[in-house]
Amino acid sequence: MNKENMPEIKIGVVAVSRDCFPESLSVNRRKALMDAYTKKYGKDHIYECPICIVESEIHMVQALEDVKAAGCDALVVYLGNFGPEIAETLLAKHFDGPKMFIAAAEESGSAASDCTRLYQQYLRV
């Protein structure tokens, strides 16, 4: 592929989570995404933000500052569980560049069972 006319960009990936789930669920899903991407395309144009936003504007500001400091030109908001909430949409609003939201597919096996059980406890079903 001729890449002469393609811009060089750096994509920042920020995971988000709901507070009714363990943060590690989104973090582990983000790591799996990053592993799959870097295995196929390398590490040159992608950055894994170490801050996971857990329904907090404080986390959002920290993540925004982190991806800016890392020199990211584009943003991927990785929904580790459930859809966008206030903090994630504010992150997209305040990031000056292209951005997109992507969502994790639900795993099978024990991880999916754990998620269902935790969410039922959260809802007190």
Regions found by a protein language model. Give the residues of each.
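Metallocofactor- and cofactor-centric catalytic cores in central/energy metabolism, strongly enriched
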Residues: 1-125
